[in-house]
Every structure is written in C-alpha cells, then in structure tokens.
UniProtKB/Swiss-Prot annotation:
It is a multi-pass membrane protein. The chain crosses the membrane at residues 16-36, 43-63, 66-86, 104-124. The keyword Membrane applies. The lineage of its organism: Bacteria, Bacillati, Bacillota, Bacilli, Bacillales. Keywords: Cell membrane, Membrane, Transmembrane, Transmembrane helix. This is UPF0344 protein ABC2900. InterPro entries: UPF0344. Signal peptide: none annotated. Its main location: membrane. It is found in: Cell membrane. GO terms for cellular component: plasma membrane. Belongs to the UPF0344 family. It holds the Pfam family DUF1516.
Length: 126
C-alpha cells in the first residue's frame, strides 16, 4: 500500500487528531508549568509526561499532514516552528521545575504558539 495514499485517504483523521493535540497540549503545558511554579513537583511531573505523549502525537500527525501537503514550504516552516515550540516548552518546564527564572522561555512559548496558531487559521500566510 502506498503510504501517501493512506495519508491522503485519512487526512481528516490526521487533521482532527492534530488540532485536538494542540489544544490539549497547550492546556497540559500551562497546568504543568503552574504546578511546578507552585511547588507541586510530583503532580507537575505526571502532567509533563502526559504532555510529552501529546508531543509525539502532534509530531506524528503533523508529519503525516506535511507528507499530504507534499512538503509545501509554508507547512514545512510551520513544522519547524512547532519543533522549536516543543523545545521551548521543554525548556520552560525544566526551568520551572528547577525553580529558575522561566519567564523568558514562557514568553517564547507564547509568541511561537500564537504565530503557529495564526498560521494554522490562515491569518499569517506567505
């Protein structure tokens, strides 16, 4: 079976999973961040691990959609930004867990997240 055909046939499933993953991931990130900042390290770690599962779901569904879009540069750049966002999220959560100043990373997460969402809704186009 041609994997490109499989992805094309199931594109709406990948898209719905991807969109849902983003929404849940944003919530999980904020919950984990504030749990760490509030000194609830164990609960924060559990939520952080669940967020990592959603990182994987988001990456797999995003890569599948990128294949379906035949690696169009707009979506390729959006994917690179998403990988950077994951890095910023991990850095922000790590700093929050260690009780270090994490406001810079939190700001980076929010800025990149807003850019990616605006790209997703077609407000930012190039």
């Amino acid at each position: 079976m041609n994997s490109g055909g499989f992805i094309q046939e199931n594109f709406s499933i990948f898209q719905a999973s991807h969109e849902g993953s983003w929404a849940i991931l944003a919530i999980l990130f904020l919950v984990a961040y504030f749990l760490f900042r509030g000194g609830k390290s164990k609960a924060g770690t559990i939520i952080h691990m669940i967020a990592r599962l959603f990182f994987v779901i988001m990456l797999v569904t995003g890569a599948s959609m990128l294949i379906a879009y035949q690696f169009a540069y707009f979506f390729f750049i959006k994917g690179i930004l998403a990988v950077l966002l994951i890095g910023f999220m991990e850095a922000a959560l790590g700093k929050a867990k260690r009780n270090e100043n994490s406001l810079g990373m939190l700001f980076a997460v929010l800025v990149v997240l807003v850019v990616i969402v605006l790209m997703g809704y077609g407000i930012i186009r190039f």
